[in-house]
Amino acid sequence: MRSSSRNSRKPRRVLGLAAAVSLLLGSAAQAGEHNFVLTAYTNGRGGQALVSGDYDSAGKALSYKPTLSAFDNSTNSNNRCVSLTVTRQWDAARIACDKAVKDAEREKATLPSFEAWARGTEDDFVAVALSNRAVLRWRTSDSEAAAADLKRAAELSPKSTFVQRNLSALEYSHQALARVDVASK
């Protein structure tokens, strides 16, 4: 659901993104730049629980229908994608991650012309969704689709560390076992 003021919502949304936290796959001895990273919005439903590793609480928070005061659909669907991916609910995660990409793209497409200044931020949100879906695709042995998602994410948000890190992890995964982290921007 859109806020009446994207001006106030977007900066808080960006500020609500937090630091990386290791979650699953691989040994702790591996170098950080070779770990996949999932990105959650900590100021969205379930976000704080995801970053702290409380996946049961995150799943419960994300199972409730949004209220009028809830964050936009792309924030919720993105966090649902992360939650289902880290809990290895692959079929549900595919649906959630596809929805996260569609919701972020829809938000970008419906951005009013007087808010064109926010276009770069909207690109970042689409890149987050694509990057998360790429991690899911890699985890379910679809490296080709993961690479396509990451390529598109890099085109939209070339300076995003989460995209660069996942590109590095995907490249590294062809040589050795990579692992997944959950992070926020």
Indicate where each model-derived feature is located.
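Flexible helix-coil transition and linker loops at the boundaries of alpha-helical arrays
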Residues: 33, 64-73, 103-123
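Terminal, low-structured helical/coil segments at or just beyond the last alpha-helical repeat
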Residues: 35-36, 136, 147-185
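Alpha-helical segment of the N-proximal tetratricopeptide repeat
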Residues: 37-68
